[in-house]
From Swiss-Prot:
Pfam family, one: CSD
Keyword Transcription among record annotations: yes
Induction line: By cold shock.
Protein name as catalogued: Cold shock protein CspA
Signal peptide: none
Length: 69
């Protein structure tokens, strides 16, 4: 499980980015992952833990299994 800070999240557009604590490249997060976690939204500066999953069709990575830290 990875940890990081929400860089920004736009609930109208349905996505945002998490800045990993380890300094890696920002991680995309989709609104569907937020909903699956039982959260309403994410706020800038919020600490979260997450897994990185790769879409088999597009090959792109995103955050999933979000939890407030």
């Amino acid at each position: 499980m990875n940890s990081g800070t929400v860089k920004w999240f736009n609930s109208t557009k349905g996505f945002g980015f998490i800045q990993p604590d380890d300094g890696a490249t920002d991680v995309f997060v989709h609104a569907s992952a937020v909903e699956r976690a039982g959260m309403r939204s994410l706020v800038e500066g919020q600490k979260v833990t997450y897994d990185i999953v790769r879409d088999t069709k597009s090959g792109k990575s995103s955050a999933d299994n979000l939890r407030a830290a």
